[in-house]
């Protein structure tokens, strides 16, 4: 009997345990739990000794300075890594798509960001954050399924709804038209078998759930949708690079995995942008993992080898070294 379970094992025992997420809105809020996850990752999943390998960590855009220092400190002092580096998630996704200039819409479980990147560097003044992501969509799906008479409340049941979301939801190209289709026929209905064998049917919920990304008012939020947020990010950039951003709009993260999302983004941004502008939305099939893939690319570059923060540099300068070496 262990005092804590991590990852898939925590999920499989979720009925008898309390499930906790140490990362909120993309930023680590519980360092003790985060340390447990890292420990589990090194020793149980990767089965590598962290003191024998350099470690590349990723962070949310606009991650607080104290957080970057804390990550650095834990890696060197708790795990004794010989070297480490912290890279911004969206930048790695862009690398994974084979680009160094573009705008990344990165949407995961807790937060979404639009990050304009020029020649490999994120432009901090133009980064926008949207506290609307996968977990909010799961909660919203729980809510609208309740209206249909299906109740999901516990942390275990939330995970079932997350699975329904991942398997059956999609983004409509034209929301009003899709609602009309759903009302007049059963062509959009799908059934889903719950773990206890009960079968539920869902219809317009399939596209109403991710529609909240484009219409946050569905969640009672007074904020711009992902399309407008991306547009606003582009408009905060120098006029000379906007053309490159419009033509290289890259989707990344699990919450961009809904079928139909790229076509809808194309349509919405085309409506916002200048009329002659070439707009291209890039949605790589592996975008759920593109941050990891980009990290793998970065860490294997010969030019990157002098970028690592070494244990020696850390011992000389302390955690603040991260701001001088990782930007």
Curated annotation (Swiss-Prot):
Enzyme class per UniProt: hydrolase
CDD domains: ASKHA_NBD_actin (cd10224)
Subcellular location per the Swiss-Prot or TrEMBL entry: Cytoplasm, Cytoskeleton
Reaction(s) this enzyme catalyzes, per UniProt: ATP + H2O = ADP + phosphate + H(+)
E.C. designation(s): 3.6.4.-
Family annotation (Pfam families): Actin (PF00022)
An example Gene Ontology molecular-function term: ATP binding
UniProt KW keywords: ATP-binding, Cytoplasm, Cytoskeleton, Hydrolase, Nucleotide-binding
Superkingdom of this protein's organism: Eukaryota
Note: There are at least 4 actin isoforms expressed during artemia development.
Biological role stated in the UniProt entry: Actins are highly conserved proteins that are involved in various types of cell motility and are ubiquitously expressed in all eukaryotic cells. Multiple isoforms are involved in various cellular functions such as cytoskeleton structure, cell mobility, chromosome movement and muscle contraction.
Protein's name according to its UniProt entry: Actin, clone 302
Organism for this UniProt entry: Artemia sp.
């Amino acid at each position: 009997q262990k005092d804590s379970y991590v990852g898939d094992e925590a999920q499989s025992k979720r009925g008898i345990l309390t499930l906790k997420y140490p990362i909120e809105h993309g930023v680590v809020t519980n360092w003790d739990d985060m340390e447990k996850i890292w420990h589990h990752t090194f020793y149980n999943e990767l089965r590598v000794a962290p003191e024998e390998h350099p470690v590349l960590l990723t962070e949310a855009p606009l991650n607080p300075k104290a957080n970057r220092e804390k990550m650095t400190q834990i890696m060197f002092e708790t795990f004794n890594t010989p070297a480490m580096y912290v890279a911004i998630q969206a930048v790695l996704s862009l690398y994974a798509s084979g680009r160094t200039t573009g705008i990344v819409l990165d949407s995961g479980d807790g937060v979404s960001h639009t990050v304009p990147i020029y020649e490999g560097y994120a432009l901090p003044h133009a980064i926008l954050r949207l506290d609307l992501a996968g977990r909010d969509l799961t909660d919203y799906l729980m809510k609208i399924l309740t209206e249909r008479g299906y109740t999901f409340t516990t942390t275990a049941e939330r995970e079932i709804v997350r699975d329904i979301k991942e398997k059956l939801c999609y983004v409509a190209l034209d929301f009003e038209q899709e609602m009309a289709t759903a009302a007049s026929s059963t062509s959009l209905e799908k059934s889903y078998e719950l773990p206890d064998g009960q079968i539920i049917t869902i219809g317009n919920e399939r596209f109403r759930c991710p529609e909240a990304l484009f219409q946050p008012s569905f969640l009672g939020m007074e904020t711009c949708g992902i399309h407008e947020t991306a547009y606003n990010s582009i408009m905060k950039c120098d006029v000379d690079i906007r053309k490159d951003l419009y033509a290289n709009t890259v989707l990344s993260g699990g919450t961009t995995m809904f079928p139909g999302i790229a076509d809808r983004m194309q349509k919405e941004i085309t409506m916002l942008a200048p009329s002659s502008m070439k707009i291209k939305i890039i949605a790589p099939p592996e975008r759920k993992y593109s941050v990891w893939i980009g990290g793998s690319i970065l860490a294997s570059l010969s030019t990157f080898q002098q970028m690592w923060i070494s244990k020696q540099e850390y011992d000389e300068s302390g955690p603040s070294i991260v701001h001088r070496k990782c930007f």
